[in-house]
C-alpha cells in the first residue's frame, strides 16, 4: 500500500516554490547534493529548478550514490528498476541491489543497457549459476568485445566452445568479435562463416570470411582453390552477383560461374561476363543451355553474343538438341526477323534416326511438319515402325494412305527407301479389297518403279479380273519394262501374257 506521502509525491506536478523548503524536504522531494526535484511529465525530472534529466538517468545516478529514498521516489515516477540496478553496480551499492534483487527477475535483461565492460561483468555475476560460456554468449549479443579481450585466453584449447561462439557471432553478424575470435583463437571450422553469409546474404560477412581464411592459407593453396570453386558454384547458382565478384577477387574460373548462371538462368551474371570470353566458351555454354533446358531470354543472350552464328558448331548443337529433346533454340533461330536459320529439317532427320515415335510426333506438332516429310525420312533411314505408325495416324482411310504413299514413292530417289514404302503399300493392300481399276493402277505402279516381287504378287491377284483388260495392262507394263530395261518385270509380264493367251478360248 502506498502511504499518503507517496501518493502526493507520485502525482505532484505543481511548482514547488509555494510549498517552502521544509515541506519539500518532508515530502522527500529534495535530493541531497543536487537540489529540489520536480516531475516533468512521465519521462523527465527537473533538478534544482535548472537541470532536466531523463528519469532513467536520474535513478541510475541516485542508485550509484546509494540514495535509497530518492531511488524509491524515482521508482514512483516510473523510473526503471533496471537502471537502478546498473547504477548500484557502478557504485558497488550491494545493499541496494540486495533489497531489490527479488524484483529484478533475470539479470541478463540488464546487460544490453550497459556500455562499461566492468559493470557488464558485475551484472552478469549477480546470477551465481551462470558460466563463462553464458558470459561470452551475451557479450556477442551485446557486442561487448572487451569481455573477449579480457578472458579470451581461457577459451584456448576449448575447441567446441570456440566453434560455438564463432558461429554465434557470425549468425548475429557481430563483425568485431568475429575478427577477434578468427585472428586470436583457433577456429576448427573457419568456413562456417561462408554458409551463414550465404543464408543471410551478408556480403560484409562473406568478405570477412576470406580475410580470416587468407590468414591461414595462400591463394595458391589447393584447398583454397577448391573452396573458391565451391563458393563460385553456389553463389552463381543462387544468383548472388556481388558474392561472385567478391570470390573472383581471390581466384577461381569465370567458366565455373557462367555454366551455373546458364543452368539456373541468372542473366545478370551472364551479361556481365559474356562479352569477355572466347567464342569457343560461348558455344559450350549454348550446348549446356540446351542440356539444362534454359529459358528463352538466356538463349537469346548467348546467341546475340555470337551474332546468332551457329554454323561452326551446328553438328554438335543438333546432336545435343536431339539427345536432350529440347527444341527451343531451333524455334528461336527460326523466329529471327531477319536471316532466319532453319534447322528444322536437320533436327528432324536426327530425330527420325534416333528418337521414338512419341518424340517425333511432338516435334511435328511443334514445328507443323507434314507427315510426308517424316515418312520419307523414315523410309531412307529404314525406320519401318515409324512409316507404319505415322502413316496410320495421318491417313486413317487405307485408300487415302495408299495414295499418299504412292506420291512419296514417285518423288523419291532413294532406292531402298522407295522399296520400303512400296512394301508398306503392299501390306496395306493385303487387307484391302481393291476394285479392278485400283488393282490395275497399283500393278502398273509397281512396274514403273521396278518392284519385281510386288509386281508378280499383283499379277497373281489380277487374274480374278477381266482377262482382256488385264492383258492390255500387261502389254503396257511390258512396254514400260522394255523402255527402262527392267528385265524381270518384262519377263513376268511376257509370261502372264502368254498364259492368258493360252487359257483364253480363240
UniProtKB/Swiss-Prot annotation:
Pfam families for the chain: DUF249 (PF03158)
Keyword GTP-binding: no
Name used for this protein in its record: Protein MGF 505-9R
Family stated for the protein in its record: Belongs to the asfivirus MGF 505 family.
Superkingdom of this protein's organism: Viruses
Keyword Cell inner membrane attached: no
Induction field: Expressed in the early phase of the viral replicative cycle.
Summary of the function given for this chain in its UniProt record: Plays a role in virus cell tropism, and may be required for efficient virus replication in macrophages.
Amino acid at each position: 500500500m502506498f502511504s499518503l506521502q507517496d501518493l502526493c509525491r507520485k502525482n505532484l506536478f505543481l511548482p514547488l516554490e509555494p510549498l517552502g523548503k521544509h515541506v519539500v524536504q518532508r515530502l522527500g522531494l529534495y535530493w541531497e547534493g543536487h537540489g529540489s526535484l520536480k516531475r516533468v511529465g512521465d519521462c523527465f525530472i527537473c533538478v534544482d529548478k535548472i537541470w532536466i534529466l531523463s528519469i532513467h538517468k536520474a535513478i541510475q545516478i541516485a542508485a550509484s550514490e546509494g540514495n535509497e529514498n530518492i531511488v524509491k521516489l524515482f521508482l514512483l515516477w516510473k523510473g526503471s528498476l533496471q537502471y537502478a540496478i546498473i547504477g548500484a553496480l557502478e557504485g558497488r551499492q550491494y545493499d541496494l541491489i540486495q533489497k531489490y534483487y527479488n524484483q529484478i527477475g533475470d539479470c541478463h535483461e540488464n546487460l544490453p543497457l550497459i556500455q562499461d565492460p566492468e559493470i557488464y561483468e558485475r551484472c552478469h555475476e549477480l546470477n551465481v549459476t551462470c558460466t563463462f560460456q553464458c558470459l561470452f554468449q551475451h557479450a556477442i549479443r551485446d557486442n561487448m568485445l572487451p569481455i573477449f579481450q579480457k578472458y579470451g585466453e581461457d577459451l584456448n584449447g576449448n575447441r567446441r566452445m570456440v566453434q560455438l561462439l564463432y558461429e554465434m557471432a557470425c549468425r548475429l553478424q557481430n563483425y568485431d568479435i568475429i575478427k577477434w575470435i578468427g585472428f586470436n583463437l583457433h577456429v576448427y571450422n573457419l568456413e562456417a562463416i561462408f554458409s551463414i553469409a550465404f543464408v543471410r546474404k551478408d556480403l560484409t560477412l562473406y568478405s570477412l570470411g576470406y580475410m580470416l581464411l587468407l590468414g591461414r592459407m595462400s591463394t595458391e593453396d589447393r584447398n583454397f582453390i577448391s573452396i573458391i570453386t565451391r563458393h563460385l558454384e553456389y553463389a552463381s547458382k543462387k544468383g548472388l552477383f556481388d558474392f561472385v565478384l567478391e570470390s573472383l577477387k581471390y581466384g577461381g574460373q569465370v567458366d565455373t560461374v557462367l555454366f551455373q548462371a546458364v543452368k539456373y538462368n541468372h542473366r545478370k551474371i551472364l551479361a556481365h561476363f559474356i562479352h569477355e570470353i572466347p567464342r569457343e566458351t560461348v558455344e559450350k555454354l549454348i550446348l549446356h543451355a540446351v542440356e539444362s533446358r534454359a529459358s528463352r531470354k538466356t538463349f537469346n543472350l548467348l546467341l546475340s553474343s555470337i551474332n546468332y552464328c551457329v554454323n561452326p558448331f551446328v553438328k554438335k548443337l543438333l546432336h545435343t538438341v536431339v539427345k536432350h529433346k529440347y527444341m527451343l533454340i531451333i524455334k528461336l533461330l527460326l523466329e529471327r526477323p531477319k536471316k532466319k536459320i532453319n534447322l528444322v529439317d536437320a533436327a528432324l532427320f536426327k530425330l527420325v534416326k534416333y528418337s521414338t515415335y512419341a518424340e517425333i510426333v511432338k516435334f511435328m506438332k511443334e514445328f507443323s511438319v507434314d507427315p510426308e516429310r517424316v515418312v520419307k525420312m523414315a523410309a531412307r533411314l529404314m525406320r519401318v515402325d515409324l512409316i507404319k505408325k505415322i502413316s496410320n495416324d495421318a491417313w486413317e482411310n487405307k485408300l487415302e494412305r495408299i495414295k499418299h504413299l504412292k506420291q512419296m514413292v514417285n518423288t523419291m530417289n532413294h532406292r531402298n527407301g522407295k522399296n520400303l514404302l512400296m512394301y508398306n503399300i503392299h501390306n496395306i493392300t493385303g487387307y484391302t479389297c481393291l476394285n479392278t481399276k485400283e488393282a490395275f493402277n497399283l500393278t502398273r505402279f509397281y512396274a514403273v518403279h521396278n518392284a519385281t516381287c510386288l509386281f508378280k504378287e499383283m499379277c497373281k491377284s489380277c487374274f480374278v479380273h477381266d482377262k482382256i483388260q488385264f492383258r492390255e495392262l500387261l502389254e503396257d507394263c511390258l512396254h514400260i519394262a522394255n523402255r527402262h530395261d527392267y528385265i524381270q518385270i518384262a519377263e513376268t509380264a511376257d509370261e502372264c501374257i502368254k498364259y492368258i493367251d493360252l487359257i483364253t478360248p480363240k
